Design a protein with these regions (language model features):
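Conserved beta-strand segments of alpha/beta enzyme cores
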Residues: 41-43, 93, 121-124, 207
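Phosphate-binding site of ATP-dependent enzymes
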Residues: 164-250
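ATP-binding N-terminal substructure of ATP-dependent carboxylate-amine bond-forming enzymes
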Residues: 1-93, 99-100, 104-106, 110, ...
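Short small-residue beta-strand/loop micro-motif enriched in glycine and branched aliphatics
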Residues: 95-97, 151-154, 240-242
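Hydrophobic residues at beta-strand termini and immediately following loops
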Residues: 45, 128, 161, 211, ...
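Short secondary-structure boundary segments
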Residues: 70, 127, 146, 212-213
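Active-site nucleotide/adenylate-binding loops and adjacent lid/helix of ATP-dependent enzymes
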Residues: 2-11, 29, 58-62, 102-193, ...
Length: 250
């Protein structure tokens, strides 16, 4: 009798998917290989907003566990919590954070509110109302970010604005580009950038993996030191080649 297959759950890629979306296929292949080496056969389960179809397939497969790789559903990052919610409804075990945690942290605004409530410093910010002029209520420089989307989608050097006029221009450039393009303005703070990864350890305590620092090599004066879309995904761009990670730093 063959062992049941662990399910690799991820969002079905749309036609002409960007580099950021295609990355999930690399993740799925890497996870699948690791699980097979540990003796767990796998099956890929791409999902769409037709959650009933996904539920029927998962029910037929009856996987011993699900590796949740869903970061977006049909291009809507704000719906990412639907994946663990579906798995909860089916009573399936899965990797990663639970539904409530993903729901509360997929919105950067909700995350910042919870950080502030917990006494953790976070830069000043202002939400934006459709059709109203931006009035952050704090001095520049500013950085314009997506409320819901991750992976630096839409983020370029022009996201950093040093006055009200450039802020308004950046908002005009990015407003209305897709279903999840809600934006907010945050105080831009120049400084070093680190990547910190956490795993759940024994007794549900967080285990912090070794930190990595992003270097900004040969950035000309005035160029914002941010990890924008090009730095993350466009491997032939100067931003990509000039932002290596290092693990040995003072």
């Amino acid at each position: 009798m063959r062992a049941p297959k662990a399910a690799l759950l991820f969002g079905l890629l749309p036609p002409h998917a960007g580099f950021d979306e295609q990355d999930v296929l690399v993740e799925a292949a890497t996870v699948s290989q690791a699980l097979r080496e540990l003796g767990h056969p796998t099956v890929e389960v791409p999902i769409t907003l037709d959650l009933r179809q996904a539920a029927r397939r998962l029910a037929r497969l009856a996987p011993p566990f699900v590796f949740n790789l869903v970061e977006s559903i049909e291009g809507r990052d704000r719906l990412v919590h639907l994946a663990p919610a579906l798995l909860d409804s089916l009573g399936l075990r899965y990797t990663g954070s639970p539904t409530e945690a993903i729901f509360l942290t997929s919105s950067k605004l909700l995350t910042k509110e919870r950080l502030r409530a917990a006494g953790i410093p976070t830069p000043a910010w202002a939400g934006l109302r459709e059709g109203s002029a931006p009035e952050p209520g704090f001095p520049p420089p500013y950085i314009v970010k997506s409320v819901w989307e991750h992976a630096s989608i839409g983020l370029t050097g022009s996201a950093v604005a040093h006055d009200g006029q450039s802020l308004a221009e950046e908002l005009r450039r990015r407003t209305g580009r897709g279903p999840s393009r809600a934006l907010f303005v945050e105080a831009y703070i120049e400084g070093r950038e680190f990547n910190l990864a956490l795993l759940e350890g024994p007794n549900h305590r967080a285990q912090v993996l070794p930190p990595a620092e992003i270097e900004f090599q040969s950035f000309p004066p005035g160029k914002p030191r941010i990890v924008d879309y090009a730095a993350k995904w466009e491997s032939d761009s100067p931003e990509f080649t000039q932002t290596p990670r290092r693990f040995d730093f003072p």
